[in-house]
Amino acid sequence: KTSSVSFIEKNDKGSWGQWSDFVKAELLITIDAKKDRIVVNSPEIQVFTIKSYGDKIESETTKTVPFDCVDNNGSKCKILVITRKDEKNRMQFYINYSELKFVYNIYN
């Protein structure tokens, strides 16, 4: 489940702007490896087809699980599930497009 969401987008010059303030967003996110699918149950349901599973990346402070995906509109994106070990294992779910990124704070 998520508690909040923030986004960032590229400006006219192609540089990333500033992350928006987090706003409340209580949603259920499901990762279904058997169906190669990730579903974000937002008011407009987002379905991502997993095209490839990346190798888990672990450092002293984070653990990252990457997925290369295609959304229900056919747009490519990279989804990252990041566990912040230095922040009591706080989890975040990133949806990264070339021009736009979303991050959801996750709680169990």
Predicted regions: what they are:
Residues 23, 41-44, 48, 59, ...:
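Mature soluble domains of exported/periplasmic/lumenal proteins and thiol-rich metal-chelating peptides
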Residues 37-39, 43-80:
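Contiguous, well-ordered beta-strand patches that form the walls/edges
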Residues 1-45:
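N-terminal secretory signal peptides
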Residues 80-106:
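Short, exposed beta-strand-loop hairpins at the edges of beta-sheets
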Residues 1, 15-17, 57-69, 104-106:
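Flexible, processing/modification-adjacent segments and terminal tails
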Residues 21-24, 31, 60-62, 74, ...:
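Short solvent-exposed loop/turn micro-motifs enriched in small/polar/acidic residues
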Residues 22-26, 45-48, 76, 99-101:
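Short, mixed charged/polar active-site loops
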